[in-house]
Amino acid sequence: HNRSKLSPDKDNGATYHDTLKSLMSVSDVLSVCCPASNETINLINKETLEYLPKGAVVTNVARGDIVDDEALIDALERRKVYAVGLDVYKGEPNLNPGYLKYKQAFILPHLGSATKETRTAMANLAIDNIEEYFKTGNCKNKVN
């Protein structure tokens, strides 16, 4: 999904949906990849899950607060949603135990960033911060 409609020379045949309802109503797989913000907290909830076709699959690799766990568990129970794949979830590392009774709930311990490239970039950022701190007494990614 793109927030803005692309020009025909860039859309690669993609269909533009101007509402979440329009997009979700034709999505057999919903992959949540947006940032957490005031606008996206509980974006995937009881109402929006009803937009999906019966038997859809939902994945969340973004932030746990974007998905209402109780609504998603209810959708699993009713078989509105066939399966879920969660790399993130509300209250990490504590998982809503409601997911545990479903064989079609695949829960990962926040491994989405566990690629060699990402971990190398994280290590390099840490080194850069340490070097900057010892040179200037400050660092770019300071945590107080």
Locate the predicted segments by residue.
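Rossmann-like dinucleotide/phosphate-binding beta-alpha-beta segment
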Residues: 1-54
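Rossmann-like dinucleotide-binding domain for NAD(H)/NADP(H)
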Residues: 55-144
